[in-house]
From Swiss-Prot:
Disulfide bonds: none annotated. It comes from Lactococcus lactis subsp. lactis (strain IL1403) (Streptococcus lactis). One of its GO terms (cellular component) is cytosol. PANTHER family: MITOCHONDRIAL DNA REPAIR PROTEIN RECA HOMOLOG-RELATED (PTHR45900:SF1), RECA (PTHR45900). The gene is recA. One of its GO terms (molecular function) is damaged DNA binding. Its main location: cytoplasm. Belongs to the RecA family. InterPro entries: AAA+_ATPase, DNA_recomb/repair_RecA, DNA_recomb/repair_RecA_CS, P-loop_NTPase, RecA-like_C, RecA-like_N, RecA_ATP-bd, RecA_C_sf. Keywords: ATP-binding, Cytoplasm, DNA damage, DNA recombination, DNA repair, DNA-binding, Nucleotide-binding, SOS response. Can catalyze the hydrolysis of ATP in the presence of single-stranded DNA, the ATP-dependent uptake of single-stranded DNA by duplex DNA, and the ATP-dependent hybridization of homologous single-stranded DNAs. It interacts with LexA causing its activation and leading to its autocatalytic cleavage. It is found in: Cytoplasm. GO terms for biological process: DNA recombination; DNA repair; SOS response. This is Protein RecA, chromosomal. Residues 352-387 are annotated as: Disordered.
Amino acid sequence: MATKKKTNFDDITKKYGAERDKALADALALIEKDFGKGSLMRLGEAANQKVSVVSSGSLALDIALGAGGYPKGRIVEIYGPESSGKTTVALHAVAAVQKEGGIAAFIDAENALDPEYAKALGVNIDELLLSQPDYGEQGLQIAEKLITSGAVDLVVIDSVAALVPKAEIDGEIGDSSVGLQARMMSQAMRKLAGHINKTKTTAIFINQLREKVGVMFGSPETTPGGRALKFYASVRLDVRGSTKIEEGSGDNKTQIGKITKIKVVKNKVAPPFKVALVDIMFGEGISRTGELLNIAVDEGIIKKSGAWFAYNDEKIGQGAEKAKNYLKEHQEIFDEIDHKVRTAHGLLDEAEVAETTEDTSTKAKATKAKKEEKVVETEEIELELED
């Protein structure tokens, strides 16, 4: 009986491998010629590149986002109930971008932006690009033009629910306009997603909440504008105010802010479902000292015993508000704790780490020199006593 000849795949690979490699190289060259460099690449060439981010303006939120901030070239959705702090969270991102020398635009579809409050949050209102569109399509077209220019680092749309289609505005109150906004948003997402990625612009869409009628099981809450934004968004944040922050006692007790929970319900660049707790103070926004105090206590950098807070075995205040005031008044201590927290969570870039290492080394040398001087002085005193 004749034996079946075994196929040797190594021989086939050797014979046709060179021809296949040449054919692939020709195809890659043709694609790059027709569609531009970078239109097709091997995944390994870009696998080690870290996702570029822009700070959210909140240390706690940067940590919860995992990557250190909002990813560049991606879409972010911030939603929550009324007066939960959605616009405040977005304005802190605007201030952070401007602080780094970037350009930010704010499309105020709700016509509700308060310039004085934005200024209090650190926004440079003289440099902020502001648009208050008459209808939804106009607002999205303005956003598209800003994004495709490649000159803007951050675009905030406040809010999706206020992006009313022109057909609905031109019609009468009570006219049926089922699906108009969803279709408008779906088309906008298809057009904007590619431009946002190419220009590395971060687009933040603020959204409201609605309730679905007749839901018996699960959450009845939903966001307006259809499902397109949910799919295209790389990050989705659920913002909800929880506990009041009050000062005074008895009848003199007044609310000065609220503890707000920001949950990362979707994240394509880091593990999701992390939570950031921030203190949003009236007229101030997210309290930098408040969030730093909370994180430092969780990390064990600041010790808490009862109502007392201590750093390096030194008491800094009885009660959170007094500890926050201490950090406000002592900028060096604030910066030192802030640096320790950022180092622990890998939020410092290589240059900052190198600079810190150099500073630490210099301080260590200075401390050692001082100790040696003290030793020499002690020896001289002992010799004088012996004489």
